[in-house]
């Protein structure tokens, strides 16, 4: 699945000195429709990077003397977290973490491989 590439995030990046060319993604409504029809992989990385970049540019434009990464990375991380929360709600996945099956640790996998428990079974 494709990112939505929100216009407001493009505008924010460009407002604070970015030079992103006009681009489009898949609207959230279309992604939601795809989910209802079986799409199970949704990309939001581009949206996350745009949210972070916009905040970093804003902080540095508003505070050109700033050089402490904590001063611009904190609002950038907050913007990304806000976007992720929004997408989890829009895609009806908020509150589903308890349904994720436990993943084996690498140490447990190594133990099970060495005992042959994970050997392929040919019928």
Can you annotate each of these PLM segments?
Residues 1-37, 42-45:
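Catalytic alpha/beta core domains of metabolic enzymes, predominantly
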Residues 26-123:
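C-terminal alpha-helical cap/extension of soluble enzyme domains
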């Amino acid at each position: 699945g494709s990112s939505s590439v929100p216009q407001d995030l493009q505008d924010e990046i460009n407002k604070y000195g970015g030079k992103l060319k006009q681009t489009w993604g898949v609207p959230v409504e279309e992604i939601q429709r795809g989910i209802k029809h079986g799409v199970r992989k949704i990309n939001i990385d581009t949206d996350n990077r745009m949210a972070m970049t916009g905040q970093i540019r804003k902080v540095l434009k508003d505070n050109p003397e700033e050089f402490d990464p904590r001063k611009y990375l904190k609002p950038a991380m907050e913007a990304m977290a806000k976007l992720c929360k929004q997408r989890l709600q829009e895609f009806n996945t908020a509150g589903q973490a308890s349904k994720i099956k436990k993943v084996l640790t690498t140490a447990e996998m190594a133990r099970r491989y060495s005992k042959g428990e994970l050997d392929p079974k040919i019928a």
